[in-house]
């Protein structure tokens, strides 16, 4: 049976979703400290840098194997290594991208994703002007080859950047081909069967939140 995908389906049930969303903030900050040669950092300093309460930082870090020392804090090098591993950034994941329009093409151009453990192995589209081309060294195929290439390349992550009207049908094709996790950039809440992970990243929703908050500005 299909259900509307909930973002929490992505998350480790042992770790609260807000915690998982904050951990990359901490990682970014301690990476800067590490680059500057800093050896230790307190939860108070981390909290001040990212704009949260120090007790929240300590609680969040209790879910990962980072040990802090009284009056010393956390070893920066250890935090960088542990957080990178815990968040999956040190592991190699391969993905296919579906919908090579302006957003999809931009993601294909973003080599920085590799630094977070994600390699986009191929793109898929139906536009004859795009199919059988390469973007940033990444081949673009017709979507009719999805099942064949998923099996051959053993890819189980899909990035969905198609127009909204095609979102559900493309998601269905992706899942039928063997995709087990979908990073959904469309504003459509796709329905998926049990056992398929979905992470919704709608820029339009974030834009709406920003516009709404701007209304309260003086």
UniProtKB/Swiss-Prot annotation:
Residues in the DNA-binding region annotation: 25-64
Keyword annotations: Cytoplasm, DNA-binding, NAD, Repressor, Transcription, Transcription regulation
InterPro entries reported in the protein's UniProt record: CoA-bd, NAD(P)-bd_dom_sf, Rex_DNA-bd_C_dom, Tscrpt_rep_Rex, WH-like_DNA-bd_sf, WH_DNA-bd_sf
Gene3D superfamilies (alphabetical): NAD(P)-binding Rossmann-like Domain, Winged helix-like DNA-binding domain superfamily/Winged helix DNA-binding domain
Chain residues that bind NAD(+): 99-104
A GO molecular-function descriptor: DNA-binding transcription factor activity
Role, per record: Modulates transcription in response to changes in cellular NADH/NAD(+) redox state.
Quaternary structure note: Homodimer.
Name of protein: Redox-sensing transcriptional repressor Rex
Similarity comment text for this entry: Belongs to the transcriptional regulatory Rex family.
Protein source organism: Porphyromonas gingivalis (strain ATCC 33277 / DSM 20709 / CIP 103683 / JCM 12257 / NCTC 11834 / 2561)
Subcellular localization(s) per the UniProt record: Cytoplasm
Origin organism lineage: Bacteria, Pseudomonadati, Bacteroidota, Bacteroidia, Bacteroidales
Gene behind the chain: rex
GO terms classed as biological process: negative regulation of DNA-templated transcription; response to redox state
PANTHER family, A to Z: REDOX-SENSING TRANSCRIPTIONAL REPRESSOR REX (PTHR35786), REDOX-SENSING TRANSCRIPTIONAL REPRESSOR REX 1 (PTHR35786:SF1)
Top-level taxon: Bacteria
GO cellular component: cytoplasm
């Amino acid at each position: 049976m299909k259900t509307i995908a909930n973002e929490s389906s992505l998350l480790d049930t042992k770790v609260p979703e807000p915690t998982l969303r904050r951990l990359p903030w901490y990682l970014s900050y301690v990476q800067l400290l590490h680059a500057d040669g800093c050896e230790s950092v307190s939860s108070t300093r981390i909290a001040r840098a990212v704009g949260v309460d120090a007790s929240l930082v300590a609680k969040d870090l209790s879910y990962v194997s980072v040990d802090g020392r009284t009056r010393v804090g956390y070893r920066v090098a250890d935090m960088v290594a542990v957080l990178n591993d815990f968040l999956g950034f040190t592991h190699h994941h391969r993905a296919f991208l579906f919908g090579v329009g302006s957003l999809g093409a931009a993601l294909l151009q973003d080599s920085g994703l590799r630094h977070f453990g994600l390699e986009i192995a191929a793109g898929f589209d139906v536009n004859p002007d795009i199919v059988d081309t390469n973007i940033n060294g990444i081949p673009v195929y017709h979507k009719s080859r999805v099942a064949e290439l998923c099996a051959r390349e053993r890819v189980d992550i899909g990035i969905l950047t198609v127009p909204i009207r095609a979102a559900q049908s493309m998601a269905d094709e992706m899942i039928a081909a063997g995709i087990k996790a979908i990073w959904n950039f469309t504003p459509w809440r796709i329905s998926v069967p049990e056992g398929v992970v979905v992470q919704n990243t709608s820029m339009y929703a974030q834009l709406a939140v920003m516009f709404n908050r701007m209304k309260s500005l003086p």
